[in-house]
Amino acid sequence: MAKRTFKIYRYDPDKDAKPYMQTIEVELDGHERMLLDALMKLKAVDPSISFRRSCREGVCGSDAMNINGKNGLACLTNMNTLKGDIVLKPLPGLPVVRDLIVDMTLFFKQYNSIKPYLINETVAPEKERLQSPEEREELNGLYECILCASCSTSCPSFWWNPDKFVGPAGLLQAYRFIADSRDQATSERLDNLEDPYRLFRCHTIMNCVDVCPKGLNPTKAIGKIKEMMVMRSV
């Protein structure tokens, strides 16, 4: 068995005047390969510790949190990569509901604002709308986003303007539909982003690329949207 020390952000609005950091030592028996496994062990010791989790396999995005100063998924973070004390905090830039749980309302408001669905006014075919292999390949690196919010909550522009700046996750998905050969609303989507804040608050800091658990590149997608904006104004 190995003893590990966790420093966890704690805040219960029903009883705490302000947040605080709690230090907990726990014996791990070697079966806790991932951070989420260790968190489940911690919760068995102290049931009041609150965090989101679901699939355990990096698909749902529920257990995103700030791990030793960097956003990531607890279920994909190997305990062997975490040296010394493990500091866990909620995703930055969003209101804290309790402990490691944040209010995702603003994040999903911005995501929904880009109309994350195909817009095609032609008569629907009996089966699927076909794409060539080349057209389908254009969506690689775009559709895999799991909406964990690690990228947007690592972005200073989103911290400062969460009500105005769409954020890396939303803009990645905006380009996912702009790039889709089956979608017919490119002009409408670009019009929706024609604003000093919604798109152009991205200053290519690239924190989003650094933290994405799926290895996606929101900055590249945002750059392509900016390029399209420029080209249509020429």
Where does each model-flagged region fall?
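Ferredoxin-type iron-sulfur electron-transfer modules in oxidoreductases and energy-metabolism complexes
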Residues: E32-D46, K89-V234
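Short, contiguous acidic and Ser/Thr-rich linear segments
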Residues: Q22-R33
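Active-site phosphate-binding and catalytic loops of NTP-dependent enzymes
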Residues: D46-R52
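Short, structured protein-protein interaction patches enriched in aromatics and acidic/basic residues
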Residues: C55-A64
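Short polar catalytic/cofactor-binding loops
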Residues: I8-D14
